[in-house]
Amino acid sequence: MIFYIISLKIKLIRDYYKYNACIYNNNMEQIIQNVNTIINLYEQFGGSDYIGESQTQLEHMTRAAMLAEEFGEQNDIILAAFLHDIGHLIEINNDTIKMGSLGIMNHELIARDYLIEKGFDKDIANIIGNHVKAKRYLVTKYPEYKINLSEASRQTLLYQKNTMSQEEMTEFESDPLFNKSLKLRFYDDQSKLLSKSIKPLDYYRNLMIEYLSESTNNV
């Protein structure tokens, strides 16, 4: 009887680990598939013009991510920087929502929803979703900030509700992701001034897989 109970316990333990290994493998397959889909967007459309800036979409987002890493940011901010304008790539052929020649209207919200669908946590998605809001906030609070924006960024502001009301500013300041959203805006703006060589896409492919697998394990 004792032997039977011990054997049963061993079997249950084995079945438990087998089950969890199966779930882990399925999760990893889905993560890799999602990340490869994202990387394919960069490979296919990343070489397109970055709305009047002197760099491509891929160069802009990668330089923003590299700058965040140089400043010692955690992976959530680094990846937010790398992914922040992916909305322009997702809807690149959708002429109905273009801001003239200045990219895709509400690209930040398109990116936010897409990344949640691809398994990213809501924090990183909402940091990205806030980066246009952060520009509007800074233009309103610090009028001199607008002077330092690139010409293309000043033009897109006209499509993005321009300045904020006091109520909007107060609401944004109370957002738990407020500071991280401003950080992303800084890297977004500053990367437009850079011309350095960029890291390969595989670097960010691996970083995304690592980030998503850790997020899944912590659920």
UniProtKB/Swiss-Prot annotation:
The keyword Hydrolase applies. Keywords: Hydrolase. Residues 57-158 form the HD domain. One of its GO terms (molecular function) is hydrolase activity. Pfam families: HD. It comes from the Viruses. This is Uncharacterized protein L432. It comes from Acanthamoeba polyphaga mimivirus (APMV).
